């Protein structure tokens, strides 16, 4: 049986971060506006007023002091409270593929491999920014790899399923070197308008 190892890893970290203090300023402004707009419904009991937050509350509840995000301005805008990630045309590499290529290059360098060594790419994450083209195909083209490439979505277990599929491909002989990439944009998963989320 073919031996399977993880020979390299790569990481993409967004360039922007949001501190608890910054998030609280935006969140509390959102709460004040929500409560003002819904004052009548709150007064008659059909809606519950939202509670403001504090940096201390967030740190005590989660241990988090700061988080890296894609598009800080959207996250800390009280009228939005989520990132604005612009759509790109299909002919342009998608943001997830761009992230994936950065981490893939780092993993290949760490493993002492080149794109020519890769004969399979599995992009495994819980949300894809767009349905077409497949992120894995974009990565394959950007790196110049051969073989096969596909996306898989198994919700929160996507990365583990991707690793398993890669190991199975190597054990079966259908691949020798597989890139498994999980370019999650978690900034877009979070509900920054919910204090308890």
Predicted regions and their residues:
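Proline- and acidic/polar-enriched loop/turn elements at helix boundaries
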Residues: 71, 120, 150-152
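Short, histidine-centered active-site or binding-site loop motifs used for metal coordination
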Residues: 10, 122, 184
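Short acidic/histidine-centered micro-motifs embedded in hydrophobic/aromatic stretches
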Residues: 61, 124, 181
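Acyl-thioester C-C bond-transforming condensing/cleaving domain
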Residues: 1, 15, 32, 46-49, ...
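Conserved beta-strand elements of the Class I
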Residues: 5-7, 119-122, 176-179
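Conserved "HGTGT" condensation-loop signature of ketosynthase/thiolase-family condensing enzymes
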Residues: 1-117, 143
């Amino acid at each position: 049986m073919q031996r399977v190892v993880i020979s390299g890893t790569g990481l993409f970290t967004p360039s922007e971060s949001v501190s608890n203090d910054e998030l609280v300023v935006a969140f509390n402004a959102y709460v004040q506006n929500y409560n003002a707009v819904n004052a009548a419904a709150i007064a008659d009991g059909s809606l519950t007023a939202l509670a403001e937050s504090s940096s201390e509350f967030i740190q005590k509840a989660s241990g988090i002091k700061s988080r890296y995000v894609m598009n800080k301005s959207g996250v800390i805008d009280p009228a939005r409270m989520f990132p604005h990630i612009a759509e790109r045309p299909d002919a342009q590499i998608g943001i997830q593929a761009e992230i994936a290529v950065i981490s893939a290059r780092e993993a290949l360098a760490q493993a002492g491999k080149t794109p020519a060594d890769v004969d399979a790419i599995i992009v495994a994450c819980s949300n894809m920014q767009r349905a077409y083209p497949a992120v894995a195909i974009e990565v394959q083209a950007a790196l110049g790899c051969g073989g096969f490439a596909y996306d898989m979505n198994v919700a929160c277990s996507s990365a583990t399923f991707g690793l398993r599929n890669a190991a199975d491909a190597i054990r079966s002989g259908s691949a020798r070197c597989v890139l498994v990439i999980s370019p999650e944009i978690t900034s877009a998963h979070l509900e920054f308008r919910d204090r308890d989320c």
